Amino acid sequence: MLTYGKPFNFQRWIDDHAHLLKPPVGNQQVWQDSDFIVTVVGGPNHRTDYHDDPLEEFFYQLRGNAYLHLWIDGKRERVDLKEGDVFLLPPHVRHSPQRPEAGSVCLVIERQRPAGVVDGFEWYCDACGHLVYRVEVQLKSIVSDLPPLFNAFYASEEKRRCGHCGHVHPGKAV
């Protein structure tokens, strides 16, 4: 028998998991214990963090539209992902996926991180652009590892205060 089971209809899988592809969960991993982290992410979803992935990320915008805010050389840039678009993000490019459309669906594929290779999550000051806070994690599960990290940032005014200008990051997007 195959390790990961038989082929299945992916569109049906998405429809069957649609209730998990919207807030508050927003995403679902297709396979567990694979060399790849294959995640389906639904909208709407607004993030204030920037992910520093040590490896490449593949995006396939299946339904609706989305965009990535990129933090490059101290400036925010935007990459639009229209329905049907694919995009390969290089390692260590800080990115913040934004999915404003309800019902939008994106397939995101990442490699499992080798032991000792960590992901970073960063928040930048809206007033001056400096790094406000960074947390690193040995990522095992996107679904379960991230909420505690994000909630710790949202709950702490100290973590959200910019050390450069004193502005307090608003935390979670509304």
Swiss-Prot record:
Tree of life domain: Bacteria
InterPro entries given in the database record: 3hydroanth_dOase, RmlC-like_jellyroll, RmlC_Cupin_sf
Residues annotated for Fe cation 2 binding in this entry: 125, 128, 162, 165
Cofactor: Fe(2+)
ATP-binding among keywords: no
Function of the protein: Catalyzes the oxidative ring opening of 3-hydroxyanthranilate to 2-amino-3-carboxymuconate semialdehyde, which spontaneously cyclizes to quinolinate.
Family, as annotated: Belongs to the 3-HAO family.
NCBIfam families referenced in this protein's UniProt entry, alphabetically: anthran_nbaC, PRK13264.1
Protein name: 3-hydroxyanthranilate 3,4-dioxygenase
Organism whose genome encodes this protein: Paraburkholderia phytofirmans (strain DSM 17436 / LMG 22146 / PsJN) (Burkholderia phytofirmans)
Name of the gene this protein is made from: nbaC
